[in-house]
Amino acid sequence: MGPDNRRVLLATVLSLGIITLWQLSPWGRAPKPAPKPAQQASQPAKPAETAAPSAPTPAPQAQPAPAPVPVNAPEELITLEGSGFRVVLTSHGGALREVHLEGQKFRRDTGGGQLEPINLVRVTEGQPYPLAVVASPELGGAQDAATDPAARAPMRLVAHDEHSATFEGRAGNATVRKVFRLTGRPYELGLDLEVSGAAAANAGVIVLYPGFMPPATKSGGFFSGPPVEFMRPICRAGQSTERFDVNGKEQMARGEGAVQWAGLDQGYFISALFPSEPKGACAFARGPVAGSGETAIRLPMEGDAARYSLSVYLGPKDLDLLRAYGRGFDSAIDYGTMARPFAFFARLLLYVMRWFERLVHNWGVAIILLTVLVKVLLYPLTAKSMQSMNEMRKLQPEIEKLKAKHGNDREKLNLATMQLYQQHKVNPLGGCLPMLLQLPIWFALYATLQTSVELYREPFLWIADLTRKDPYYILPLAMGVSSFVMQKLSPQPADNSQAKMMLYFMPAFFTFIMLSVPAGLTLYIFVNNVLSIVQQQVMMRRMPPAAPGSAASASPPTVSARPAKR
């Protein structure tokens, strides 16, 4: 392969890297295959492989059924202030009406510069509120249960204080008592659920967690960047974490194995329900309108009455908080199919940036310091690369002579150029290695910006959110200029057409791609380019100049036409 073709190969590799970055994004990522479709017949849930055996929870004595609540009973709302969040409970279904996250970081622009706390509860007309309960004989009926009027039936508020609220009512033929309580843990709400009267007819109770992605929050095209909000039903069943595409072909699917936790993945946030121990089964279903869906957990009845103690996590996907829960909860952070091989590097970059952020208290500066650290670690390879580029620059006069000698005969020109490199022991690809080593870091940093709530809505200079594109396109344009300067300072290929492609097309194409990439990644690449330019100039000045006649006096290689091999 000739040296010019090697340059084309490098350009192809970089293009593939850029295309891969495109595929990593939500607007370029292929949808995940849906979990196994649900069967109509009820199937017993498989026990969790790692769950320790435990004795069944003693069933409470069945209490007399409370008087039915009128269907037109007015809605009662109770607010509980927890650690990092505020929940509003409704008597309609005894469920979550609103979940607001506290802190300036967790605010959403509602238009006109107005910010309001993020609300994790998003349901559409016809959906029950999260944590509604329905008695059902099988999990296959979860889709029907989501539209069952019993899921929205009024319940009676029987007790409440600043730390808890208790609701009683009926769900179909079952008597239900719910006690919501603050646990003191960040973003956690406890739920004590008592159900009686459902065993004979249904032998099970379903807890619903529906959600809705408003169409207005979807991506509006390439230059708008990836969607800020999205919603996917999610379940950790057994040792597998499964997600359901609400816009896919399947109407319903179920998880296999005892439920560790289940709920809704909401990008940088998650709402998840934890049974006290892995049990039951989960299912996913599409909602009544496009963009809506629900996760359902079916808990078995053991006798005529049963009591369940559950925990509900309602907050950001902070890696430390998720790991504290165990049960594979950190698998809720999904780097996507393309970036999954770089998950280790993504978490490593996050740890390094967190350490820098604690020192400088700004994530943009932390990214700059990360760039400097990577340049220092790659310095030995960069120095060797610069030396190789310097040697190639010395050979430019000889390459020009070869071009004049062989004219348009590319085969002879490439062969003569390669012989010239071999004669002077120059590796034409030596200058490419540091850039190739940067590609995994780009992928990992992109995945980190798309999944790590630590960087969500973190500002830097004029940029309000490093996880979103630069709204003024200053960084992408600056990055394009720096890429052009780097190419201009690098030795050019012998082929003028290839030289023009490397000098003009690649920086322009790269700039176009980076217009909608998270600003944090663009900042990293721009700073890396600037450091590379400075490093190149400093090292070139320190390198000894070419000895007089060292390359110019050397006779250019004589190339004779070789007969083609048969």
Which residues does each predicted region cover?
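Mixed-charge, polar/low-complexity N-terminal
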Residues: 1, 60-62, 66-69, 244, ...
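Helix-loop-helix
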Residues: 1-39, 89, 191-194, 215-227, ...
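Intrinsically disordered, low-complexity sequence elements enriched in Ser/Thr/Gly/Pro
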Residues: 4-5, 44, 84, 150, ...
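Juxtamembrane extramembrane loops of integral membrane proteins
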Residues: 24-120, 167, 171, 556-566
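Generic low-polarity alpha-helical segments
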Residues: 68-73, 80, 187, 534, ...
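Preference for short coil/turn "hinge" residues that link or interrupt alpha-helices
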Residues: 73, 111, 173-175, 257, ...
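Soluble non-transmembrane domains of integral membrane proteins
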Residues: 77, 81-333
